[in-house]
Amino acid sequence: PSEEKNQDILNIIFTNKLTCTFDENDFRYHARALVGSNPIIISTTGIIEAPAKPKQYYLDLMTNFSKEEIEEIKKKYKGQFLEYGDSRIPDIIEGYVLQAIFYYETGDAFCDNNQCRLFNSHWQKDLFISQLGNKKMCKKHEEILIKIKNKIA
């Protein structure tokens, strides 16, 4: 709607398309779960594909080329990374929505504390800690959230 075409309203787009950004430092594209702007884009495919799976998983895949062996490797690591249709995805999306709100309100979506829902997880195991294991924000970001709520109220 035309009344929402301004920077005073946060718009979040959810897509199943893989979003990427180009890094000038290494001249590569990197998959992203969240692309910060307004509108902010949250990619459900990016949530699954962007954070890396366990290192040993990739090593096992590189040394086993048959289709049967690949299926065995996937079984071996089942539960250690997200898959399409995974029942944990909605809980993880909540954390990305929080990151989107913080990016819009403060210009900074992420936290260095892996116990905070705003942690920028580069590995699936870290994603599970910050988004599923703890499901809370650190004290610093909890205080900022209270200020944001008070500003809106």
What does each of the following model-derived ranges do?
Residues 1-114, 118-122:
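Metzincin-family zinc-dependent endopeptidase catalytic domain
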Residues 108-152:
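Post-HExxH zinc-binding segment in Zn-dependent metallohydrolases
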